[in-house]
A protein has these predicted regions:
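Extreme N-terminal starter segment of soluble prokaryotic enzymes
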Residues: 2-4
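Acetyl-CoA-dependent GNAT
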Residues: 7-10, 18-88, 99-101, 121, ...
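Short secondary-structure boundary/capping segments
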Residues: 50-52, 72, 106, 140-143
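Conserved GNAT acetyl-CoA-binding A-motif
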Residues: 106-118
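Conserved catalytic-core motifs of GNAT/GCN5-like acyltransferases
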Residues: 115-117, 132-150
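Conserved active-site tyrosine of GNAT-family acetyltransferases
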Residues: 126-127, 131
Length: 156
C-alpha cells in the first residue's frame, strides 16, 4: 500500500469531515461511551464548521490512491490539533507516515517543541514516538467529560 502525503485543498473538506466522524465513532464504547463519542463528533457532522476549520488549519492529508485515509494538523507554534486515520486503514502505517512528515516539516520550520492533547487511544502511538505525558485532562465537551492527555516532544 503506497501512502502519499498531500497538502489540503478545499475539495477535501467533506471527506476529511466524514473521516473524523468515522474515527471517533469507531472507538470502542468501553474506552469512550457512545454519548462521549457523540459529544466529540456530532451526527450528522457539522460540515460548515469543518469547512471553515480545515481552511484555517490546512492539514497534511494522507492518500492511498484517490482516497483520503488520514490527516494531521500542525500549527505554527508546534501544536498538533488533530491526527486521525480512517478506521479501515488503522495499523497500516498511515499515521506513522503522517507524523514523520509533520515532524520533518516542524524541524525545517525551526519548531523546537511539538505538543498535543492525545485521546486514550492515541496516547500509546505518541509515546512510541518520544512524546511524554504532562497531564491527564478531563475536558467537558457538549455536556460529556472526555479524558485526554497533554503531551510534548522536544525536537533536537
Amino acid at each position: 500500500m503506497k501512502i502519499t502525503i498531500a497538502p489540503y485543498t478545499d475539495a477535501n473538506a467533506t471527506e476529511i469531515t466524514d473521516l473524523h466522524h468515522a474515527c471517533v465513532h469507531a472507538i470502542s464504547p468501553t474506552i469512550y461511551s457512545l454519548e462521549q463519542q457523540e459529544a466529540w463528533a456530532h451526527t450528522p457532522p457539522n460540515y460548515p464548521y469543518w469547512v471553515k476549520r480545515l481552511a484555517l488549519k490546512k492539514p497534511f492529508v494522507a492518500m492511498v490512491e484517490a482516497n483520503i485515509v488520514g490527516f494531521i494538523e500542525l500549527e505554527e507554534n508546534g501544536h498538533i490539533d488533530c491526527a486521525y486515520t480512517h478506521p479501515a486503514y488503522q495499523k497500516h502505517g498511515v499515521m506513522r507516515e503522517l507524523f514523520a512528515y509533520t515532524q520533518n516539516v516542524a524541524q525545517k520550520k525551526g519548531i523546537k517543541r511539538l505538543y498535543l492533547e492525545a485521546s486514550i487511544v492515541a496516547k500509546p502511538f505518541f509515546e512510541k514516538r518520544g512524546f511524554v505525558s504532562l497531564s491527564r485532562n478531563e475536558i467537558k465537551k457538549n455536556g460529556q467529560m472526555i479524558v485526554n492527555y497533554s503531551m510534548e516532544k522536544i525536537l533536537s
